[in-house]
């Protein structure tokens, strides 16, 4: 029964952000763990000299994991300038994009200024000038605005439960299923395995491939209650 309620939260969150499939919802401890998961799993498959683009107004959770991965895998990080009103300099972003750009990860709503970048416009620019994955920090955005990941055209979204009036210690990373399927897990053990041998192991299907250890049943169910509350008061008001 508890497992059923836990899995029901995936479906609730899928509908809340209009994801394609509930299996695309990965539970984490929050945005910080989400960015660490993505940076560790994605960057290991990049080439030396490949580039990551962030902005000058990012939360530390969306900077430090990329810095650590860049140092480990010899990648380069570039930062989009912001103007005096803390808006992203779109012309500067265009100048940074190249064939070496593999990741663009930016904030959806700034916790510093309240700045709301035009995500659809930025995604279109990024995709037209590179083959980069687009990652959105939704910590402040998702609790306050209606978010449709299909409409935005993004590849990954990180969310923290406590920002959504839910419990601490729970969050979500949404990603396109074909991307999750192509990525390696970061943590090992528990139900993330399918079969274990003396010399190797095979992984469970997504989403469980990325959820090692005992699941956060209580926290996830609490997050589901927060999603219900936000849905009932309408995200468009």
Predicted regions and their residues:
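Pyridoxal 5′-phosphate
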Residues: 1-237
């Amino acid at each position: 029964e508890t497992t059923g309620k836990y899995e029901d939260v995936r479906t609730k969150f899928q509908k809340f952000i209009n994801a394609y499939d509930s299996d695309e919802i990965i539970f984490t401890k929050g945005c910080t763990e989400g960015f660490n998961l993505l940076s560790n799993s994605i960057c290991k498959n990049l080439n030396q000299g490949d580039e990551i683009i962030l902005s000058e107004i990012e939360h530390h959770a969306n900077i430090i994991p990329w810095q650590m991965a860049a140092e480990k895998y010899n990648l380069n990080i570039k930062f989009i300038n912001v103007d005096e009103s803390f808006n992203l300099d779109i012309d500067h972003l265009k100048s940074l994009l190249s064939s070496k750009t593999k990741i663009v990860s930016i904030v959806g709503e700034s916790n510093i200024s309240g700045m709301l970048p035009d995500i659809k416009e930025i995604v279109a620019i990024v995709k037209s000038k590179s083959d980069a994955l687009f990652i959105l920090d939704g910590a402040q955005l998702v609790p306050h605005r209606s978010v449709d990941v299909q409409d935005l055209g993004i590849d990954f979204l990180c969310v923290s439960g406590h920002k959504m009036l839910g419990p601490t210690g729970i969050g979500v990373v949404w990603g396109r299923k074909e991307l999750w399927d192509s990525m390696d897990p970061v943590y090992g053990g528990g139900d993330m395995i399918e079969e274990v041998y003396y010399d190797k192991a095979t992984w469970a299907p997504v989403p469980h491939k990325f959820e090692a250890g005992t699941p956060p049943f209580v926290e996830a169910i609490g997050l589901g209650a927060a999603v219900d509350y936000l849905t009932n008061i309408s995200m468009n008001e």
